Amino acid sequence: MALLCLDGVFLSSAENDFVHRVQEELDRFLLQKQLSKVLLFPPVSSRLRYLIHRTAENFDLLSSFSVGEGWKRRTVICHLDIRVPSSDGPSGPCRPPASHPSKYRGPRYTSHQGAAAGPRGAPAGRWHRGRKPDQPLYVPRVLRRQGGPVAASIPGIKGEDPAGAVSEEEPREAGAGDAEADQGIAMLVTQELLKSPDPGHANEPQMGLGDTEPSENPEKEQGAETAVQQGSGAQLAMEEENRSHGMRSLVDQEEEEIEGEEEEKVDEKEEDTGKQKERVDEEEEKTDAQEGKVDSEGERMDEGEDKVDAEEEDEDEADADHGDFSELLQEITANLTEKEIKIEKIHLDTSAFTEELPGERDLTHLVEIYDFKPTLKTEDLLATFSEFQEKGFRIQWVDDTHAIGIFPCPASALEALAKDFSVLKIRPLTQGTKQSKLKALQRPKFLRLSKERPQTDSAVARRLVARALGLQHNRKKELPTPPSVLPS
C-alpha cells in the first residue's frame, strides 16, 4: 500500500493505515443516507483527530467537528445539510455586511483648531487662556506717560463723576495689555485708604472742614453708657442661673425614674434566667438517657452505611458516565440544525492507535488531596508534606477543597498514601474526581516525572561557570615523562 502524502510530508505506516480505515468508515456512513445520524469517534490523540478532519474534507457531503475537553475530546461526522453554518465565511466578522454601514463621524478639532473656529475671546465650556491681543514691541516713554490719567479717572476716588471714569483719548481693548493701568489703580486705591481715618479710632474727636463741634462732656456720656450696660448684664446673668437650676432639677428627676425602671427589669430577667436554668437541667437529664439509646442505634447504622457507601460509589460512576454523555449530546446538537439525532459509533478498533493517550500508568505519581478546610493555603499543605519537599513535591490547586499532589516518583506517592494526615485526606488520582483528572491530563507537564539533580563536584562547577561566562577553563595538562636514559 502506497503511503499518503499530507502537507508535503509522507505519513507513517500506522497513520497511513488509520487514514484508510477512516475512509472506509466514512464511505459506509455516507451510503446509509440518513441525515438524522451522526458518526462519533472515540477519544484519540490530537494528531489522529487532525487526520480524521483532513480525511472528511475529501467528502463533499460530510462535515466534521470536535466535542469534549482534554483527553476526552472526540470527533463527530455529520451530513453537511444539517450542519450549522459557521461564521468564518465572507459574511463573518472579518467582512461586515453592507446592511450595516459604518457611522460617519465628523472631524475632531484639536484645542487650537477649536479656539480658532469660534469668536476670539469667547469662553467655551470652561475657562481657557485666550490669546493675548497684539501689542507693539516698544512703546515710547511719552506714550507710556499718557496712560497715567486713565488710571486716575476711577469712579469713587477724589469725588470724580463715575460717568467719566474711562478716558476717550485712549480706547484700548480690555485684556492682558492693561497690566500697567491695573497697577496704577491699585496704587491709588491704597493711597486713598491710607488717607481715610482708621475705623478703630472713630470714637476719637477729629476736626475737619465740614465737621460739627464735638460734644461738651464726652466723658459723662461714656460713663452713663457703661453703667447701663453693666446693669443689663447683671440682670441677664441672674436669669440664666435660674434657668440652669430648673433644668438640673428636671434632669435629676428623670434619671431617678430611669434607674428605677432598669432595676425592675434586671430583677425580672434574673427570675427568668433562673427558671430557664431549671428547664435546661431537666432537658439535659432527658438527653443523657436518649444518648444511650442513640449510641446503640449508631453502631447498627455504621454497619449499614458501609454497604450504602459501596452502592453510592457505583451509582456515582454511572451518573458520571451519564453526565458525560448528556454534555456530549448538548455540544453535538448545538452544531446541528437537526435536534433529534441518532449517534452511531464507528466499527473501527482504535485500540492499536491509542498508545499515545495518557492512561492510569501515567498518573501513578499523582495523588488527589481532598476533605480539608477551604481556609487552608498552599503553605499549609506544603507543611503537611514537608518530608517530601526536598524530593521535589509540588501542589496544583483544582478548587477550594481539592488539589493535586505531584510527587517526583511513584514510590514517594505510595509512601505518602500509606500515611494518615489529620487535616486532610489523599487518594490516588485514578480514584479522584473528574475535575482533578481533567486538570492533570490537560497539562502534560504533570505527567512528566521530575528528574533528580545529578551529583556534581567543585571541578564540574568551575567548568560550567567558566563555560557560561565565555572564559577558557585552564586545565593542567600532564606532560609525558621523558624516558630515562640508562647509563652505559
Curated annotation (Swiss-Prot):
The lineage of its organism: Eukaryota, Metazoa, Chordata, Craniata, Vertebrata. One of its GO terms (molecular function) is nucleic acid binding. Signal peptide: none annotated. Gene3D superfamilies: 3.30.70.330, R3H-like domain (3.30.1370.50). This is R3H and coiled-coil domain-containing protein 1. Pfam families: R3H. CDD domains: R3H_unknown_1. Keywords: Coiled coil, Phosphoprotein. Residues 252-265, 302-319 have a biased composition (Acidic residues). PANTHER family: GROWTH INHIBITION AND DIFFERENTIATION RELATED PROTEIN 88 (PTHR21678), R3H AND COILED-COIL DOMAIN-CONTAINING PROTEIN 1 (PTHR21678:SF6). Residues 244-321 form a coiled coil. Residues 266-280, 287-301 have a biased composition (Basic and acidic residues). Residues 16-81 form the R3H domain. InterPro entries: Nucleotide-bd_a/b_plait_sf, R3H_dom, R3H_dom_sf, R3HC1/R3HCL. The gene is R3hcc1. The modification Phosphoserine is found at S232. Residues 114-125 have a biased composition (Low complexity). Residues 87-180, 195-322 are annotated as: Disordered.
